[in-house]
């Protein structure tokens, strides 16, 4: 499972914000600020490509009227304010994995940027801030790649770390010379972070239409107007793709995808993905495209020895959810614990309507907060919950979970399985 996760291609859907001082600095010229941001992304993309990560710019916002937070020279205060704004305002408007603020302000001391360590995919902490500290956009791009590196679990390099050139991207001190490589330590940090946390948001590939920056032929990502993209003509090894034009070579039907083989579509009915479990189905090619469309068993089909019902290709049961939250020995609490969900307080509720927590009706108590018994020597409390004010949804019973015979959770209610 871990190896499969590590091998999977990762995608960071990036949102960039430029503050009001940036807008003034570039002569109140929106096009100039945008071009600066696009140039920066075009430097970041190949840096992360070497780490099996594609960085796609899915959003860009320029604060051309006034700042939406109080940007100040204290970097840690500004980072906290930016992260809170992202969590409470930006995320509800535009889905993305990571946000970085580019500011024209001078931070105190030698700081050129700041980012939360290991924050990727977290509602509250997948963010960084960077000072537009140099006219050379390569150096600013490397500073953003550095803060994103922190978000992706990389710490500062120690003296023993190397990337063949000195310094590397995660060096603790900003360098005047551009370095486009991560050190051996950074790669190890990142790998260990991925294995430990398995962040899910970066597995989702963005749509071509999600990308807001102009298409760049040679960045390994097929964008609007391209048929394929295998990198530069110098590095491309794909016989199906013309690297200079990002168009398919003559006679080729496709260049990549689970239903593409030697530049041709695989035949209709060819299996392209085996069934993962009893709620999944084997996926097959259509013979007309490279897509391997995900199919699964109908919702409501019994699974896991009748302990659950299939829901969107998975079999969510409370026992597994308790193990995921509290460790391998955890079990589901007794029914009496679930009565706390009738209180409608800050953690015990069934759903939220316009940010108001709605208490569970008696028949719905098993569709609110999940109660578990950790079964560990240090915790003998029979009614435990997982609750984090930064991510209140984590620790709720998952949609589709069996809550009674013939019933499953939907929007905080225990309803008939149809």
From Swiss-Prot:
Motif (D/ECD-tripeptide): 278-280
Pfam families the record matches: ADAM_CR (PF08516), Disintegrin (PF00200), Reprolysin (PF01421)
Protein name per Swiss-Prot or TrEMBL: Zinc metalloproteinase-disintegrin-like crotastatin
Primary localisation category: secreted
Cofactor detail note: Binds 1 zinc ion per subunit.
UniProt KW keywords: Apoptosis, Calcium, Cell adhesion impairing toxin, Disulfide bond, Fibrinogenolytic toxin, Glycoprotein, Hemorrhagic toxin, Hemostasis impairing toxin, Hydrolase, Metal-binding, Metalloprotease, Protease, Secreted, Toxin, Zinc
Native source species: Crotalus durissus cascavella (Northeastern Brazilian rattlesnake)
Domain Disintegrin: 214-299
GO biological process per UniProt: apoptotic process; proteolysis
Residue positions binding Ca(2+) 2: 280-281, 283, 294-295
Cofactor section: Zn(2+)
Catalytic site positions: 147
